């Protein structure tokens, strides 16, 4: 059993992710779960499959969150094995988390119209990017003026993957062309956080409608217009794994 501390192991693992060019948002998520994971045992070397399963079962998480937490555990302990810190991974034989197929809940047009008319200027702009471009909160908050090349908007999505989106909305085009830096400046690496962006979006939408519902609205409208599921999926940044 190796007695290296959580701090030592987590620091080495996060450096490993950074060296591999993983997105800042991805590293932030991994750091969060590693912090939560520290309650499993005094050090990573004392974590067993049973303790790991008890930790996962002890949280009232949604399936997507549970899968994310388990994924971090898999990658973290695999790294410790590869680095010679552990002989075997306690996450090796965890059963995969079942995540039911998601059902789209597009925002009603009335909700979109009301938000665009009544929301503060900054939040209304966020609504436009979500409803008209299908951007996630984590993509909206990191937008910069130079992401627009005059024809296409380049968006860095999940896992640092870049996709291009055609823009026709004059308000969005003007906002990008008149912005030399971050479109939504803040305290997280110079821009707003995804969590705060999602909160702002939710604040101008009716109960039961979220910022992600605006993204679903975009997907629904785009599919109705094209009937091309692959093209819509590419614009929205859906990735097959």
Predicted feature locations:
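Active-site/catalytic core of tyrosine-dependent DNA strand-transfer enzymes
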Residues: 168-208, 212
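Short basic/aromatic active-site micro-motif
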Residues: 207-226, 239
